[in-house]
A protein has these predicted regions:
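Conserved phosphate-binding catalytic cores of ATP/NTP-utilizing and phosphoryl-transfer enzymes
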Residues: 1, 242-318, 587
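Gly/Thr-rich phosphate-binding beta-strand-loop-beta motif of the actin/hexokinase/Hsp70
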Residues: 1-24, 126-146, 284-344, 522, ...
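Conserved phosphate-binding loops in N-terminal lobes of ATP-dependent enzymes
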Residues: 53-212, 749
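Phosphate/ATP-binding catalytic cores across multiple sugar-kinase/actin-like superfamilies
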Residues: 172-201, 276-307, 464-516, 532-535
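Glycine-rich phosphate-binding/hydrolytic loop that grips phosphoryl groups
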Residues: 263-285, 366-367, 548-606
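Long C-terminal appendages of very large multidomain proteins
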Residues: 619-738, 745
């Protein structure tokens, strides 16, 4: 069985493909990955589940019942986190305020390998002590250390189990993948799946794990992601007792010691190119009955000059924009037919351009909260008699940067009050009538909230408001605050560039119109909003009749996630596209020949330099290194260049030699020693030089590291006085190291 995973910033989905040898029948042996809730096992999640992670111990009953079955480890579950709806419910109902119990999405924090400051906690209250227990549980506590590193990688004398759980946020990805692996292993061998897919008597084994990656993910993060997947495999195999606990797991020979074969890991395809394959396959097979030539001929643009030596009408240039929850990705792929005839034609893809920005749906949600929800709350407070409502909101929901009980309450307020309100506004906008200029949302906070916030959150807000109200005034009811929005005003604001999503969309559409594409595919949940659709139509990167909106796109019954013959949620196209890629490699798609091996990802880091503090732009005078190529074996940086520093900086990159092109943060260069900081604050200037790590004749470089540093007068600086750390959190609006969903700071002055 092959498992295909698309781990997103907001949602994750998976597809399972079984290989029955000679009995294969196209796409019949596929199933969606379904995550079962462990606290209420009668419930299954939707195939598209949220990426939120919460610590929670899996309890299946007392241990001595397990012994009666003849196995003492029948109740072992190799993971201590939950994902999906169960994690969301646990986060919504959480009462404790002592430390964090979860995170909005581990993929956002792959870069952060520093141990956490506070211990992680399970998010249920323990009966006897009435406190939340620390997040350690058998079997994983004996397989990793306090920082979340697997013990089999450490030298023998350093192998200590978990005492205080301070796992770094990057290792939470390992925890999440452990949980998904455990669920997948349970599903492929469950009775229902075996009966449905045929051959109910044969046991199933995982053969490959295929992960799709966003275009916006830099090479360094990609390597960390591969590492986390490998660690999760090792931990699950050791926790289930399939591999000796203390043995190493790195080489294929050591992996052969395990009782159950270890699956291979594959990460080559990016999400945007995979999404195109779904459209290509469906058009060729369903609409043109397998006649690929007439399909290419019908859609090729007559006004684009063909390249020399290419017959007109035998090539197609497809662009796709994928606006997800955390990243906006775009790819332009050129598809070429070889000289076959009829259905016996092979399609060869060639990736022309790809780009990704870390601004997407969640930033749109924050904009909605700041434009609509908070101003109406502020007006209601002023009407009730609060003299300085702005200051009150800033202390309650602003960015104080402290980690204390108040910070946890602030994060829970964002999760339980503001995010549901923001989602309600967005879904009303999505379903509104485009032709009605007066369409809007007129309701109170209480009408829009399906589930009321917990008493802790209500007390936190209520006490602060009661203090600020003049004495003798009636109590303020937050559920009666009116919310009045006109959608036409939102759309005008989006077109005028007052939302953060507008800039990346402008950049992407500019690139697409430069390449004269034949078709533009638009996928992702935020593209269902009338405002976003209006913006793309207004920019018109291709003629409007050549834009395909994937949420309304009709697919036939072959599509695993289809709802009433349509792609219900366009997020699933990446996983299904990767499934088609994988089947095409084994020639398991009848009447559709596709050379999938050619869609490789390339690194988009071309220009590296210091980012501006306020907005993510990289000005030409701030560029340090030009024309970097991280895919070339033996690549090096120019050793003659060195750069002056006057404080902590953020290094970012962009792909094009154009200062308007949005840049993405990559590293933080910070000064550790207090003495060095004093010298620089005086009149010293620090000079720094970078180099590439892991570059040799055969292998391309992996990442940047500090080469050396010295002061103006030539004194060398010790290596530990400076740190160059990965930090790819997109926006300077977030307090340095936390995304707004995890810090709860939604109010900006």
């Amino acid at each position: 069985v092959d498992l295909i995973l698309d781990v997103g910033n907001t949602h994750t989905c998976g597809v399972l493909i079984e290989d029955h040898g000679d009995a294969n029948d196209g796409l019949r042996q596929t199933a969606e990955l379904q995550v079962r809730s462990l606290s209420e096992p009668q419930y299954l999640n939707d195939p598209l589940f949220t990426s939120r992670v919460e610590f929670s111990e899996a309890r299946f009953g007392k241990q001595h019942f397990s012994v009666e079955s003849g196995r003492d480890d029948a109740f072992v579950w190799p993971s201590i986190v939950r994902v999906g709806d169960e994690a969301r419910a646990l986060a919504m109902q959480r009462v404790g305020t002592e430390g964090s119990s979860g995170i909005s999405s581990p993929r956002r924090y792959l870069w952060d390998e520093t141990p956490a400051l506070q211990d992680w906690r399970f998010s249920q209250i323990h009966g006897k002590t009435q406190r939340e227990a620390l997040a350690t549980a058998f079997p994983l506590m004996n397989l990793m250390n306090d920082d979340g590193q697997p013990l089999f990688r450490l030298p023998h004398e350093e192998r200590l189990p978990v005492f205080s759980p301070q796992y770094s946020r990057s290792t939470l990805m390992t925890h999440m993948l452990c949980e998904i692996l455990a669920q997948a292993l349970g599903q492929i061998n469950s009775v229902a799946t075996r009966l449905r897919l045929g051959f109910p008597a044969s046991p199933r084994q995982l053969r490959t794990l295929i992960l799709t990656l966003p275009s916006a993910m830099p090479k360094q993060e990609r390597e960390i992601f591969r590492q986390r997947m490998f660690e999760a495999l090792a931990l699950v195999w050791k926790a289930m007792g399939w591999h000796p606990q203390d043995e190493d797991f790195t080489t294929p020979k050591q992996r052969e010691k395990s009782v159950v074969p270890v699956p291979e890991i594959q990460m080559e395809w990016d999400e945007a190119s995979c999404g195109q394959l779904v459209w290509l396959y469906n058009e060729a097979i369903s609409h043109y009955a397998g006649r690929t030539e007439s399909f290419f001929n019908a859609l090729a643009r007559p006004d684009r000059q063909p390249e020399p030596g290419v017959v007109p009408g035998r090539a197609l240039r497809v662009a796709s924009i994928d606006i997800g929850g955390g990243t906006t990705d775009m790819a332009i792929v050129h598809y070429q037919l070889d000289d076959g005839v009829g259905a016996n034609v092979k399609i060869t893809p060639h990736l022309l351009f790809r780009e990704g920005f870390k601004v997407a749906g969640d930033d749109l949600l924050l904009d909605i909260i700041q434009r609509c929800v908070l101003p109406s709350l502020q007006t209601a407070l002023q009407r009730a008699g609060v003299t300085d409502a702005a200051a009150l909101l800033a202390t309650l929901f602003g960015d104080s940067g402290r980690i204390d009980t108040q910070a946890i309450l602030r994060q829970q307020t964002a999760l339980q009050l503001f995010m549901p309100l923001g989602h309600a506004v967005l879904s009303a906008w999505e379903q509104s009538d485009i032709n009605d200029p007066f369409a809007g949302l007129h309701a109170t906070f209480g009408d829009l909230l399906i589930r009321r916030p917990t008493s802790n959150v209500m007390n936190y807000i209520q006490q602060a408001i009661d203090h600020a109200l003049p004495s003798g005034s009636p109590t303020f009811d937050i559920f009666n605050v009116p919310l009045q929005i006109q959608f036409s005003q939102l759309q005008e604001a989006l077109l005028a560039g007052q939302f953060t999503l507008t800039t990346p969309l402008h950049a992407v559409c500019e690139a697409i119109s430069h390449y004269h594409c034949d078709i533009l595919l638009v996928t992702g949940r935020p593209t269902c909003l009338p405002g976003v659709q209006a913006l793309i139509r207004h920019l018109q990167p291709v003629p409007v009749n050549r834009i395909v909106w994937m949420d309304k796109y009709q697919v036939h019954e072959w599509y695993p996630f289809s709802q009433q013959g349509r792609i219900g949620n366009p997020k699933s196209t990446a996983a299904v596209g990767a499934m088609l890629c994988s089947l095409a490699l084994d020639l398991r798609l009848p009447r559709f020949n596709f050379k999938a091996a050619d869609i490789g990802a390339y690194s988009t880091v071309r220009y590296l330099g210091v980012l501006d503090n306020t907005v993510n732009t990289l000005r030409d005078e701030n560029i340090w290194y030009h024309e970097i190529d991280l895919d070339k074996p033996g690549a090096t940086l120019d050793a003659r260049l060195h750069f002056p520093l006057r404080g902590n900086v953020t290094l970012g990159f962009r792909q094009l030699a154009n200062s308007r092109w949005p840049a993405t943060p990559l590293y933080c260069l910070s000064i550790n020693s207090a003495e060095l900081a004093k010298t620089i604050a005086g009149d010293g200037v620090l000079n720094v030089r970078l180099k590439l790590r892991g570059s040799s004749k055969d292998s391309a470089p992996e990442s940047f590291i500090l080469s050396d540093a010295w002061l103006q007068d030539g004194t060398p600086v010790a290596a530990d006085a400076l740190t160059l750390k990965l930090n790819t959190l997109a926006d300077r609006r977030h307090s340095g190291s936390h995304y707004w969903i995890d810090s709860g700071s939604v109010y900006l002055k």
